């Protein structure tokens, strides 16, 4: 455990970790302070940060299970101590760490008798087990246990609402949130005119509290960046009728203006999440640090095809959207 003496800056606003410990492989704790803040600012930041920590950070979980010998979810199999449902519940608790975008497959293939744990899961190279000792099942006889798994990276949680079977696989509830809990408290000083924000974070081990704080902060910044590039548009308020009329202005109308201006800063104000890209393309671009239209135009077709998980069809789809809405194209190669 690491614990530091708390000192408060009187000039520059700064974060500091004042306590850090690992209670277990699946429970990390961190305590942070932010100071100095004016009265009222700590609560504003604390509420937003807690929300971002619990709801905006992505995690990786098992979402579907294919059990070859199971006739239904509540069946039992000779030679396995647990029921199929109990195995599903154990798989639900497995904590994974990855930079995965989208979904991937994993599996378990083992012969009994013996103890089946998380270390027996055969994973793709970009996915790791946080706690390899997590229990899955006990095999009491020399039988073969073969299970197919679907792994997904997402945020929030997925609750199965009905048995949506796909190729004999079963959906399981998945809690993607790597932050198990987050609390904030406020302490006043300086004649009650200044505040210190204390933020406590507990994670499941797939991220450290410091990593979670960094990602939550980045997600909040991403939400507010568009306001830095706002331009005055045709906005008319009719007080008498209590109505608001807005011009039918879209991101594509904005690009029409950009073609006339040809300004680099203007291109930076169009973010890729404003375009019509499918989630897979958007996630891959974001992973490659392509956030704006300008970032995208600085790449060639050859650059895009080198992006992990990108296919030629994805590049063609990007070219189609650029051509249709912006009358823009990407060179095949960089000169």
UniProtKB/Swiss-Prot annotation:
Single Gene Ontology BP annotation: DNA-templated transcription
Pfam families membership: RNA_pol_A_bac, RNA_pol_A_CTD, RNA_pol_L
Location of region: Alpha C-terminal domain (alpha-CTD): 264-335
Catalytic reaction list: RNA(n) + a ribonucleoside 5'-triphosphate = RNA(n+1) + diphosphate
Region described as Alpha N-terminal domain (alpha-NTD): spans on this chain: 1-231
Known EC number: 2.7.7.6
EC main group: transferase
Keyword tags: DNA-directed RNA polymerase, Nucleotidyltransferase, Plastid, Transcription, Transferase
Compartment list: Plastid
Domain of life according to the entry: Eukaryota
InterPro entries xref list: DNA-dir_RNA_pol_insert (IPR011262), DNA-dir_RNA_pol_RpoA/D/Rpb3 (IPR011263), DNA-dir_RpoA (IPR011773), RBP11-like (IPR036603), RNAP_asu_C (IPR011260), RNApol_insert_sf (IPR036643)
Main location (coarse class): plastid
Gene Ontology terms for molecular function: DNA binding; DNA-directed RNA polymerase activity; protein dimerization activity
Gene3D superfamilies: 5' to 3' exonuclease, C-terminal subdomain, DNA-directed RNA polymerase, insert domain, RNA polymerase, RBP11-like subunit
GO CC terms of this entry: DNA-directed RNA polymerase complex; mitochondrion; plastid
Function summary: DNA-dependent RNA polymerase catalyzes the transcription of DNA into RNA using the four ribonucleoside triphosphates as substrates.
Family statement: Belongs to the RNA polymerase alpha chain family.
Domain commentary: The N-terminal domain is essential for RNAP assembly and basal transcription, whereas the C-terminal domain is involved in interaction with transcriptional regulators and with upstream promoter elements.
Quaternary state and interactors: In plastids the minimal PEP RNA polymerase catalytic core is composed of four subunits: alpha, beta, beta', and beta''. When a (nuclear-encoded) sigma factor is associated with the core the holoenzyme is formed, which can initiate transcription.
Protein name (Swiss-Prot/TrEMBL): DNA-directed RNA polymerase subunit alpha
Species the sequence originates in: Cuscuta exaltata (Tall dodder)
Name of the coding gene: rpoA
């Amino acid at each position: 455990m690491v614990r530091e003496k708390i000192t408060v800056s009187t000039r520059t606003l700064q974060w500091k970790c004042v306590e850090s410990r690992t209670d277990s492989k699946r429970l990390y704790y961190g305590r942070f302070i932010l100071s100095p803040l004016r009265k009222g600012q700590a609560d504003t930041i604390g509420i937003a940060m807690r929300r971002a920590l619990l709801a905006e950070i992505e995690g990786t979980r098992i979402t579907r299970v294919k059990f070859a010998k199971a006739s239904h979810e509540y069946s039992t199999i000779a030679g396995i101590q647990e029921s199929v449902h109990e195995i599903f519940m154990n798989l639900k608790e497995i904590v994974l760490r990855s930079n995965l975008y989208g979904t991937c497959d994993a599996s378990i293939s083992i012969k009994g008798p013996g103890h089946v744990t998380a270390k027996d899961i055969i994973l793709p190279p970009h996915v790791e087990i946080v706690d390899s000792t997590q229990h899955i099942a006990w095999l009491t006889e020399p039988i073969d246990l073969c299970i197919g798994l679907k792994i997904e990276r997402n945020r929030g949680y997925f609750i199965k609402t009905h048995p949506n079977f796909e190729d004999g696989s079963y959906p399981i509830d998945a809690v993607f949130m790597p932050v198990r809990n987050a609390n904030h408290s406020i302490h006043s000083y300086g004649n009650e005119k200044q505040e210190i924000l204390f933020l406590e974070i507990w994670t499941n081990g797939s991220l450290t509290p410091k990593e979670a704080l960094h990602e939550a902060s980045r997600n909040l910044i991403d939400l507010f960046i568009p306001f830095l590039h706002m331009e005055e548009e045709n906005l008319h308020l009719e007080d008498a009728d209590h109505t608001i009329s807005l011009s039918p202005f879209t991101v594509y109308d904005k690009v029409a203006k950009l073609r006339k201006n040809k300004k680099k800063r203007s291109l930076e104000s169009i973010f890729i999440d404003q375009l019509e890209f499918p989630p897979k393309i958007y996630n891959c671009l974001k992973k490659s640090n392509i956030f704006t239209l300008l970032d995208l135009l600085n790449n060639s077709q050859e650059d895009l095809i080198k992006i992990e998980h990108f296919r030629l069809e994805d590049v063609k789809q990007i070219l189609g959207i650029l051509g249709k809405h912006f009358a823009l194209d990407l060179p095949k190669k960089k000169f």
